[in-house]
């Protein structure tokens, strides 16, 4: 790019009201979307509704006053078509009014992702997600320590999620106080899988933050340690596979940068073949693998859930049952469909099956195409730019995709916001990116590491 036409990087006035207000709105929004159960357990469904409504109004106000036209123009045809397919499934649903409302709620959730893409650059975004993750993980560890060491027992939510005085199952507790007994911890999120999900994202943004922003060495070490600790204590096998995919992707992207096209593509072919062989081996040997990892051979009931979901899909493969995102209690065919150990489950535990089940085959095809295009664009951004900053979007994206073969988090809350953010922001013109360096990321990271070691 011509140096004359390259835009000058804006240095934000971090003490200005505008900067602080939008940053705090982002903090509160990301926290609420990542920790929705935490908010609900603390202030109830009514409080959660008020919280969400206030944040949505604030987001609309921030968006409207900042001239978002160019960002809105970057919304791709695939995302617009996906919303259209979801509305079509709602129109053909037996509970069409509820389904239309669910599409609206999904669009409202996506609006926050649109605003994040518009209001912040990639560097500011990594700080936002890092700071929120630090708070969530530190609070989770303190919460678990309080339950296990001081209270020495389980903690119920302030607003319980069951009727009567008898707790139906352990899953209804906010935390089970397992910090010292070897079982899974739940943290302030109230769910071990959610804690692992946030920990995976945290691990990525902490590493990138350490590489590019120059955060205090001790803060970075403590942050990375908390992410690793929460990952290990939450014991999510699905997230374990996702983290492995993230690590392999990071190595491949660093190795491929700056290489000739034929060399890059050779790396990619080897990586894809290895990933395919690994995935097939895991599926064929899932019983032995999951038993060795201390899990049930059916992946904690997932194979049973998938069989039931596929049975429903074959009854309405084209139009779907109508979009809901999370399955709604009391609605057929979801009420009582999946009950494990007295706990009802309201997702297919696979984002692709859930999209097909609810939105129909058209929504699934559009969704898959949108993910593929976004993956390619994010990968190109990570490999072609010399700054480590642009690694975090593709690594988080890959982690989300792999995790959502055993979960459906991508279709709601923080998952949908991140997907919307990546789908839109990756389409920003090159002029809005940071300047290219003279050496590949792997060289700069090695030099930075050596320099830090010498300074110790």
Predicted regions and their residues:
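Transmembrane alpha-helices of multi-pass inner-membrane enzymes
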Residues: 394-456
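Long extracytoplasmic/lumenal interhelical loops at the membrane interface
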Residues: 288-307, 311, 315, 319-359, ...
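Transmembrane alpha-helical segments and their membrane-water interfaces
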Residues: 94-150
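Transmembrane signal-anchor hairpin modules in multi-pass inner-membrane enzymes, especially those
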Residues: 1-94, 124, 428-456
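A membrane-periplasm/extracellular boundary helix in multi-pass inner-membrane enzymes
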Residues: 142, 146-151, 251-297, 312-315, ...
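Alpha-helical transmembrane segments of multi-pass inner-membrane proteins
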Residues: 130-253
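Helix-loop-helix junctions and helix-breaking kinks within/between transmembrane helices
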Residues: 39-50, 92, 96-104, 191-193, ...
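Hydrophobic transmembrane alpha-helices and their immediate junctions
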Residues: 359-398, 434
């Amino acid at each position: 790019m011509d140096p004359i036409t390259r835009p000058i990087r804006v240095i934000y006035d971090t003490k200005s009201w505008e900067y602080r207000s939008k940053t705090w709105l982002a903090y509160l929004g990301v926290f609420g979307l990542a920790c929705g159960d935490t908010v609900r357990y603390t202030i109830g469904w009514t409080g959660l509704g008020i919280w969400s409504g206030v944040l949505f109004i604030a987001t609309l106000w921030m968006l409207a006053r900042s001239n978002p036209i160019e960002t809105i123009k970057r919304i791709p045809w695939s995302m617009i078509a996906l919303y259209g397919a979801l509305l079509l499934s709602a129109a053909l649903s037996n509970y069409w009014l509820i389904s239309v409302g669910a599409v609206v709620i999904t669009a409202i959730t996506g609006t926050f992702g649109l605003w994040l893409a518009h209001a912040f650059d990639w560097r500011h975004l990594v700080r936002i997600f890092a700071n929120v993750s630090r708070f969530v993980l530190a609070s989770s560890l303190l919460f678990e320590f309080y339950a296990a060491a001081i209270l020495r027992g389980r903690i119920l939510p302030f607003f319980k999620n069951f009727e009567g005085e008898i707790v139906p199952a352990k899953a209804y507790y906010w935390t089970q106080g397992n910090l010292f007994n070897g079982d899974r911890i739940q943290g302030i999120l109230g769910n071990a899988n959610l804690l692992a999900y946030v920990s995976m994202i945290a691990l990525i943004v902490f590493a990138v933050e350490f590489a590019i922003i120059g955060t205090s060495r001790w803060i970075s070490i403590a942050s990375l340690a908390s992410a690793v600790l929460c990952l290990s204590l939450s014991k999510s096998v699905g997230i374990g596979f996702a983290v492995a995919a993230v690590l392999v992707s990071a190595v491949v992207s660093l190795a491929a940068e700056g290489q000739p096209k034929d060399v890059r593509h050779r790396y990619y072919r080897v990586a894809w073949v290895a990933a395919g062989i690994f995935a097939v081996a895991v599926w064929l040997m899932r019983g032995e693998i999951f038993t060795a990892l201390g899990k049930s051979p059916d992946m904690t009931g997932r194979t049973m859930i998938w069989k039931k979901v596929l049975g429903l899909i074959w009854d309405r493969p084209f139009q779907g049952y109508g979009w809901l995102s999370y399955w709604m209690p009391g609605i057929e065919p979801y009420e009582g469909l999946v009950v494990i150990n007295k706990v009802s489950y309201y997702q297919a535990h696979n984002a692709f099956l859930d999209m097909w089940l609810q939105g129909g085959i058209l929504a699934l095809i559009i969704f898959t195409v949108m993910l593929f295009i976004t993956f390619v664009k994010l990968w190109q951004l990570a490999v072609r730019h010399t700054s480590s900053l642009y690694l975090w979007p593709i690594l988080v994206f890959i982690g989300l995709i792999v995790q959502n073969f055993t979960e459906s988090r991508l279709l709601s809350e923080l998952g949908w916001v991140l997907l919307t953010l990546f789908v839109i922001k990756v389409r920003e013109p090159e002029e809005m990116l940071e300047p290219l360096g003279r050496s590949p990321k792997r060289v700069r990271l090695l030099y930075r590491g050596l320099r830090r070691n010498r300074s110790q």
